[in-house]
Regions:
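Single conserved hydrophobic/aromatic residue that forms the stacking wall/gate
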Residues: 160-171
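Charged, compositionally biased N-terminal leader segments and the immediate start
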Residues: 1-28
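Gly/Ser/Thr-rich beta-alpha loop segments that engage phosphate groups in nucleotides
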Residues: 26, 31, 146-149
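Structural motif
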Residues: 30-31, 98-99, 136-137, 162
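Short conserved micro-motifs on helix faces and helix-strand junctions that flank
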Residues: 26-27, 109, 141, 163
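Small-residue-rich anion-binding loops in enzyme active sites
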Residues: 31-109
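Well-ordered mid-protein domain cores that form the structural environment of catalytic cofactors
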Residues: 99-156
Length: 171
C-alpha cells in the first residue's frame, strides 16, 4: 500500500513520498504529512539488535512507500558511511542508570547530520523516479550548524560571505 502525503493547509493537495521530497513544501505553503502513521513491523526487542542502517530502513520503508527496497538501502548506505567517525553512527551509552544517545559523530559534529546526511540521496533518487532531468540546486543562508550540515551532502559549490568566521569559496 502506498502512503499518500497531503498539505497541512489543504488536504486536497496530495503527493507520493518522492514527490513530497522533491517539492519540499506544498503549493499553499503547508507541509506534507502522511494520511496515516504506519505501524513499525519490528518488535522493540529486535530493534536493540539492529544496526543504525537496519533501523533506518525499517522505519523509512513504512513512510517512503514508493521507494524500492534497493533504492532505500542504497540511500541509507551512502548516507551513513565513513562520514561518521563510528560504525555505530549513533552509539547509545549507559551511565549511572541513564542512557545517552550520541548524535555528534557526523561530518559537521552536529545532531543535524543524522537527518541531513540522507537528504541528498533521497532527493536524487526521487528526481530519478519522477523523471526530473534538471540539476538540484540548494540555496541556504545560515549562520548556524543547520546550513553547514545541509550543505555537507550537497557540496559541489559553497560560497561563504566575507563576514563569515571561515572565509572561503569551495568549488
Amino acid at each position: 500500500m502506498n502512503l499518500v502525503y497531503h498539505s497541512t493547509r489543504n488536504s486536497e493537495e496530495t503527493a507520493t513520498a518522492s514527490e513530497a521530497i522533491l517539492k519540499g513544501l506544498t503549493s499553499d505553503g503547508g507541509l506534507f504529512v502522511p494520511d496515516s502513521i504506519p505501524k513499525l513491523n519490528v518488535a522493540l526487542e529486535d530493534l536493540t539488535k539492529m544496526s543504525y542502517q537496519e533501523i533506518a530502513y525499517a522505519v523509512m520503508k513504512e513512510f517512503l512507500t514508493d521507494f524500492t527496497e534497493e533504492e532505500l538501502k542504497n540511500c541509507i548506505a551512502n548516507a551513513y558511511d565513513e562520514k561518521f567517525d563510528t560504525t555505530e553512527i549513533a552509539p547509545l551509552h549507559e551511565a549511572d542508570g541513564a542512557y545517552y544517545l550520541e548524535l555528534f559523530h557526523g561530518s559537521t559534529i552536529a545532531f543535524k547530520d543524522m537527518a541531513l546526511s540522507i537528504l541528498p540521496h533521497l532527493m536524487t533518487t526521487a528526481a530519478r523516479k519522477n523523471q526530473v532531468k534538471n540539476d538540484i540546486v540548494i540555496l541556504t543562508a545560515t549562520s548556524g550548524d543547520t546550513g553547514k550540515a545541509a550543505l555537507e551532502g550537497f557540496k559541489d559549490c559553497l560560497l561563504y560571505t566575507s563576514d563569515a568566521a571561515d572565509d572561503r569559496i569551495s568549488v
